[in-house]
Amino acid sequence: KMGRVGLHTHPYILASHSYAEESSPIHRGVFVSRKILGRTLRPPKEAVSFRNADYNPNWTMRQKVTALTKPANCMSCHDLINATGFTLEGFDTTGRTRTNLGTKPLNLSTEYLDENGNQKKLDGAQGLLQEALKSTRSSKYFIEELCKHLAKHPIQSYSNLNFLELSKMLSSKKLAIKDLYLKIAMQAATDDFVFDN
């Protein structure tokens, strides 16, 4: 349940998606939903600012965020955002692990609606990682982002890279990340290059 498992638990990622004094399940949930799970979120119709002073100081961030996002027009996106963000409450604002908030134990379990509409139980950062590893959308998004990072172009720009095949190979563990990295780098460097014999 606790500990570092995957990119989403790196202290830099966690700290950069926190408030100065508190963790932020909303910012962390948006990051994980978009960048780890590859899910699409639309911008909110009405942006509501979080102000810690508006809530009981004895409440956990989970209680505060649940109260803030309770309206139906918020929950259309916050079902996903909150479910993924609450799994990372085992990390404080700087990314250190924690099991309690003061004297209260943290609840890291959530109900998550996956990309196919199936209800899943996520149990902390490990549960989130397991869901990401099972998701074909996650592997596709990872490959797209890696290609943009390495080649500075979308993967569709390279005719010899079969995006779906790479995604299936990555998901089924037939392709290691380092080999994917090399494949993309080589393709980007040699695309449309004619070798003389």
Residue ranges with predicted function:
Residues 1-150, 156-197:
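Active-site substrate-binding loop specific to GH73 endo-beta-N-acetylglucosaminidase modules
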